[in-house]
Amino acid sequence: MKIYLDVCCFNRPFDDQTQDRIRIESEVVLTILNRCLCDWVLVGSEVIDYEISKIPDDEKRTRVEILASISRKRMAVDEDLVKRASEFEEIGLRAVDALHVASAERSADVMLTTDDEIIRKAKRLIRIRVKNPVRWLMEVVENES
């Protein structure tokens, strides 16, 4: 299974853990990353690297880079990817989010994000599943049983 996490997911373990949703999503993201060490393939991208490089807090950026570094496959941005991303921009996604969606579509079986707006908008056009990590992992665990 090839999994694409957007930067929201990589940031989640370092967000405010006093909120229940954030804490649960954080635990699930770490569980998914752990499974990517042996069972699944984490897909990285130039878009992920770029967005992580823009994290202003040096300590948080370094921690996020460490999590993202376990990716075993990496998507480069090319003209076709930018063209596909522009289609996602037309439905209202921000440019960087559109690039994530296009990268995931080309390289992964599922794109995971904690951004409900991306899920709502992208799932209508993308050829792979776009899910919240908690909901997706619950489905996977149920199917494994």
Predicted regions mapped to residue ranges:
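Short, basic, glycine/proline-bearing loop/turn elements
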Residues: 14-18, 78-89
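Phosphate- and divalent-cation-binding pockets in alpha/beta enzyme and binding domains
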Residues: 51, 84, 120-121
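Alpha-helix capping/helix-boundary segments
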Residues: 9, 48, 81, 99-100, ...
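PIN/NYN-family metal-dependent endoribonuclease catalytic core
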Residues: 4-58, 69, 73-76, 134-141
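Acidic, PIN/NYN-like endoribonuclease modules and their adjacent C-terminal/linker elements
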Residues: 2, 16-23, 34, 90, ...
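Short, aromatic/basic amphipathic alpha-helical patches
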Residues: 58-66, 120-126
